[in-house]
């Protein structure tokens, strides 16, 4: 770790180890014993389902989380679940990624940009009134479609 001492940010990947894994605990203890100022951030994929996000949080919350990093924003159909977890657990969003190239696609988020992106994704999901009218008109005029 000595060569990294002058770096502003060093990301250490736990390679999917659960929060209660002995190897992870040793890794965290070695960082603490080296008197390295370390902050633990939970990495959450914005493409994950709510149960997966909650399981990750509950697995790692004992590690003393300083916040979270949201990944795969460019692939997500919605940001509601991942932002809901961050807000509900009071995890500050330290970084976001919106592409596969790190560090180029790693950004410090701005709350208004996250909210704007989430609202934009939600608005894109909602069908127009015309589309809904055509769908229901088709069901009304063709009873066979209603049956299944």
List each model region and its residues.
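Switch II (G3) loop of P-loop NTPases
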Residues: 1-26, 33-35, 42-46
């Amino acid at each position: 770790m000595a060569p990294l001492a002058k770096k502003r940010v060093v990301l250490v990947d736990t390679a999917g180890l659960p929060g209660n894994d002995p190897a992870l605990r040793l890794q965290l203890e070695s960082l603490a014993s080296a008197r390295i100022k370390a902050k633990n951030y939970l990495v959450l994929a914005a493409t994950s389902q709510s149960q997966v996000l909650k399981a990750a949080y509950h697995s790692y919350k004992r590690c003393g989380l300083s916040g979270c990093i949201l990944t795969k924003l460019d692939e997500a159909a919605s940001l509601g679940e991942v932002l809901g977890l961050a807000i509900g657990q009071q995890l500050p969003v330290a970084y976001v990624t919106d592409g596969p190239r790190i560090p180029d696609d790693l950004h410090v988020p701005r709350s208004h940009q996250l909210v704007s992106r989430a609202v934009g994704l939600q608005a894109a999901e909602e069908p127009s009134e015309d589309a809904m009218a055509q769908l229901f008109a088709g069901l009304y005029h063709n009873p066979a479609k209603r049956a299944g």
